[in-house]
Amino acid sequence: MDAELAEVRALQAEIAALRRACEDPPAPWEEKSRVQKSFQAIHQFNLEGWKSSKDLKNQLGHLESELSFLSTLTGINIRNHSKQTEDLTSTEMTEKSIRKVLQRHRLSGNCHMVTFQLEFQILEIQNKERLSSAVTDLNIIMEPTECSELSEFVSRAEERKDLFMFFRSLHFFVEWFEYRKRTFKHLKEKYPDAVYLSEGPSSCSMGIRSASRPGFELVIVWRIQIDEDGKVFPKLDLLTKVPQRALELDKNRAIETAPLSFRTLVGLLGIEAALESLIKSLCAEENN
């Protein structure tokens, strides 16, 4: 029974984290209350109605099914989870019906191709009226990955001790990373003579060259950024490499204004259509 109870509670913790990863980022003034409610949801687990091992197994099966669904939805899989609990309640606290507990968690998992290990502490203080919980320490270890853009975000999540932001933002980051990779690969296959990926489809840049315009080159830099609140969004920039003679002949400053025009094009057509339009415009003569 004890082993099954422990497994049920571990599954509940995983489900609570995955549910948070599905939610949109809350407004700053909502964050504190929503975090507290999420921690409370993990522990408000009613065992009074369970009278046999069969009841536990039924509940365990239900939680495993829910965890599988949420893992499929978010792409986040928790492989291992362990917890140690230390009772910090003093005699004075006991007399006031206050309980203070420190939980030390370790878990490992992955979000698609990104593998992570987490070590974090949760301090719980409970009295007759309410239960408050807070992450007091967070250490994130990321396995070597193609996603170099994650390093700054991981440091910020550790500094803020924001476990929920880590899961939520990681989910959306990986979605954008996979979309960028698929888009670069698709354009390379469709326009093999014009598109080059010097660091492969997983990199953040794509080059466009034209055989009919030697020395003229466009480079798309597509970064995936995570802001201070954990919101994930793409940022695309256009860099131009042109011969000096072409710059001198560009009386309408089309080359100079190309980066701004490209951002406008992305806003109007969307990312993939804007990139393809750029390729076609540069390589119009080859296509004809």
Curated annotation (Swiss-Prot):
Please tell me where this protein is predominantly located.
Answer: nucleus
What are the entry keywords?
A: Centromere, Chromosome, Coiled coil, Nucleus, Phosphoprotein
What are the coiled-coil residue ranges? Answer: 1-71
The UniProt entry, under InterPro entries, shows: CENP-P
Q: Among its keywords, does the record have Lyase?
A: no
Please give the Pfam families that the UniProt record associates with this protein. Answer: CENP-P
Query: Where in the sequence is Phosphoserine found?
Result: 38
Q: Name one GO biological process term.
A: chromosome segregation
Record bears the keyword Manganese: no
One GO cellular component assignment for this chain's record is: cytosol
| Cell compartments where the protein resides | Nucleus; Chromosome, Centromere
Q: What does this protein do?
A: Component of the CENPA-CAD (nucleosome distal) complex, a complex recruited to centromeres which is involved in assembly of kinetochore proteins, mitotic progression and chromosome segregation. May be involved in incorporation of newly synthesized CENPA into centromeres via its interaction with the CENPA-NAC complex.
**PANTHER family given in the database record:** CENTROMERE PROTEIN P (PTHR28577:SF1)
- Subunit arrangement? Component of the CENPA-CAD complex, composed of CENPI, CENPK, CENPL, CENPO, CENPP, CENPQ, CENPR and CENPS. The CENPA-CAD complex interacts with the CENPA-NAC complex, at least composed of CENPA, CENPC, CENPH, CENPM, CENPN, CENPT and CENPU.
Family statement drawn from the similarity comment of this UniProt entry: Belongs to the CENP-P/CTF19 family.
What name has this protein been given in UniProt?
Centromere protein P
Protein species of origin: Homo sapiens
Q: Which gene encodes it?
A: CENPP
